[in-house]
Amino acid sequence: MNHTGIIRTATITGVAAALGLAAVVPALASPLSDPPAARSTDPVTTVADLDGDGEIETVTAQLTGENDQVVSATVHGTFISIHPGADSAVPLDAPRVADLDGDGRAELIVTRSVGANTTFFTALHYDGRNLGQVVDNDSKPLSVAEGGGVAAHLGYRCTPLDGGGRIFETVGADPITYSGTRTVHTLRDGALTTRKTIPITARPVTDPVLGTDAASCAQTGS
């Protein structure tokens, strides 16, 4: 199966350092305080057309241990699953159903870790036999951030292409100006390949290039 499309990402000098700011530690609870409730291990579900055949599959995510989750589905009678990891300190969200390249087959945007103001996601795809992680140009699992609070402006969006397909853009910036690079990739069989890198300098945060809209990446009909 070929998974093709154009992916556009943006990387920003200094954003990683901004995200490294320590969160304020809450005051210690008194000795008489009730202990925190255990995190739920109940499964969460969504629906997606993983192979683009018009049939809808139920996708389930469930915490299975310390910093581990399993994401699973059944496609044409075959059970498939993957363990992409998770932040077991917070409740688990159901995967977001996306179609990053507009080919009709779903990618799953899965939460990996949650900070005070920033959530980090990875992406999964169905290769015709099992679920796998979308990887970057270095064959490492894709990581996408959203949020950033006062330290950064982070997110992603998709834009339709003339003639079909989609552009997938990830955005990262400080809250005043946007400086860094925009990198154009193709997506094939769950792997990103860099095609072009475009430098960007001193864009204001109100510039449309910084617009983010996760819903614009949703799979049509999901």
Protein language model regions, located:
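Short consensus segments that form the blades of beta-propeller domains
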Residues: P36, Q62-L63, R112-G115, A173-I176
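Terminal domain-start segments
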Residues: N2-L92, P208-S222
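Mid-chain, structured segments of secreted extracytoplasmic proteins
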Residues: I80-T111
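Acidic, small-residue rich beta-repeat scaffolds with periodic aromatic anchors
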Residues: N2-A10, L28-S30, D34-V44, L131-G132, ...
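Acidic/hydrophobic-patterned starts of short beta strands in beta-sheet-rich repeat architectures
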Residues: G52-A61, L100-R112, L161-E169
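Short loop/turn segments that connect beta-strands within beta-propeller blades
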Residues: H76-G77, D127, R188
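Long, charged/polar, surface-exposed segments that mediate recognition or autoinhibition
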Residues: D99, E107-N137
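Structural motif
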Residues: E66-V71, A116-T122, P175-H185
